[in-house]
Design a protein with these regions (language model features):
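Accessory regions of macromolecular translocation/handling assemblies
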Residues: 1-177
Length: 177
């Protein structure tokens, strides 16, 4: 019973916040999960920053009353099972609706992290509900070219891409919104 509850919780985390490989499968199979999050959903604009170990959501009790030496081995086995199924790997969820996220560090690492976060947003939020404007230095344009294929980066009302990397694109995009 503990094992089934543990697996059920683990699957729920994995379903709601799939890893990169699973997300790629969702995209490649044109899954109905694409754009599944609506602005009214609690998890709209949520991204995962990584994984961490935490306690399970249910409680496992182990009573020590009446333990005799005859059942000491059984008790020890139960204690080990409780220990094994009390901790679960969860996603570190970050809500962009209520917080800002700043990234500092090596630009290669930062660009990979940004790619991960933007992909999470682009897969599960519709381009009608989320529009992305990327502002970056013209020298970094090669690192951001992949974004031009995302419908979220095309500002629907203006028929312009939300890619700001020069004075010209700044004036074109930011003065239009």
């Amino acid at each position: 019973e503990i094992y089934h509850q543990y697996i059920k919780e683990k699957e729920a985390y994995y379903y709601n916040y799939p890893d990169t490989v699973q997300t790629a499968k969702i995209i490649n199979s044109y899954s109905d999960r694409i754009y599944e999050r609506l602005p009214s959903d609690k998890d709209f604009l949520n991204i995962t920053l990584g994984r961490y170990q935490d306690e399970i959501s249910f409680r496992v009790d182990l009573r020590e009353k009446g333990i005799t030496s005859d059942i000491n081995e059984l008790y020890e086995e139960a204690r080990l099972l409780k220990k094994e199924y009390s901790i679960i790997e969860k996603e570190m969820i970050f809500d962009l609706k209520s917080s800002q996220l700043g990234l500092v560090g090596n630009s290669l690492f930062i660009h990979e992290q940004l790619k991960s976060y933007i992909c999470q947003l682009a897969v599960f939020q519709s381009y009608r509900d989320l529009q992305i404007i990327a502002i970056y230095d013209e020298k970094q344009q090669a690192s951001f070219n992949w974004m031009k294929w995302l419908p979220h980066c095309k500002l629907q009302m203006l028929n312009v891409y939300g890619m700001v990397y020069s004075d010209r694109t700044r004036d074109q995009v930011l003065n239009s919104i």
